[in-house]
Amino acid sequence: MSLQAIIEAAFERRAEITPKTVDAETRAAIEEVIEGLDSGKYRVAEKIDGEWVTHQWLKKAVLLSFRINDNQIIDGAETKYYDKVALKFADYTEERFAQEGFRVVPSATVRKGAYISKNCVLMPSYVNIGAYVGEGTMVDTWATVGSSRQIGKNVHLSGGVGIGGVLEPLQANPTIIGDNCFIGARSEVVEGVIVEDGCVISMGVFIGQSTRIYDRETGEIHYGRVPAGSVVVSGSLPSKCGKYSLYCAVIVKKVDAKTLGKVGINELLRTIEE
């Protein structure tokens, strides 16, 4: 069989593939693809006759590579830090990582006192002391979870997202992201704002305590809270005098958990009626 055919066939039975059960031919094919991607021999997408073409079989090989390898210690760049707070993983062994059940990509930094739940994935990101990251959550590249911030289960914090946090003043409430939320790239949620369960925040949305969160269906304006199931984009509202507009976050639709589970995030954001 061709390399592509081996990958396609393996992907159809991917649920059966583990590091212990994968056959030699399949492992070799997957590793050949990964090496090819690493060297530039293969590209997941390339321009052919002026059109971008995606090679889905290469993506399948990447997904399969997660099935055939166990987690292992990966040494990062050697450096030194000078701080009062230790790093969470400073004394972790391979057994400890395996027991706790999350993945940590090189350059991700977590300070001692932050909690990372099972099945989380930390891309090169920063999680500060006192933060809680719920089960199954992805903290994507350059995302920041501030001190004492609470992130729910099955959340995706996209690239460059900031969940702001400060330890003082003591009376300030932490920013909270509920379960099953998606926070789009480069968005910021700060100042103790609560994003309730099942919300989808588009990229580039900034929400603090003074941000008006406008529900276009009801005309209601929220402060400091995004209601459950909201799909939110950035927008603006006119001033009372009508001479200018000021930034706001706009709730463009509501979705329930069933819809959120069936419909892709991109589809929710692209099917917005103006």
Swiss-Prot record:
Keywords: Acyltransferase, Amino-acid biosynthesis, Cytoplasm, Diaminopimelate biosynthesis, Lysine biosynthesis, Repeat, Transferase. One of its GO terms (cellular component) is cytoplasm. This is 2,3,4,5-tetrahydropyridine-2,6-dicarboxylate N-succinyltransferase. PANTHER family: 2,3,4,5-TETRAHYDROPYRIDINE-2,6-DICARBOXYLATE N-SUCCINYLTRANSFERASE (PTHR19136:SF52), MOLYBDENUM COFACTOR GUANYLYLTRANSFERASE (PTHR19136). Its EC number is 2.3.1.117. It is found in: Cytoplasm. It comes from Actinobacillus pleuropneumoniae. The gene is dapD. Pfam families: Hexapep_2, THDPS_N_2. GO terms for biological process: diaminopimelate biosynthetic process; lysine biosynthetic process via diaminopimelate. Homotrimer.
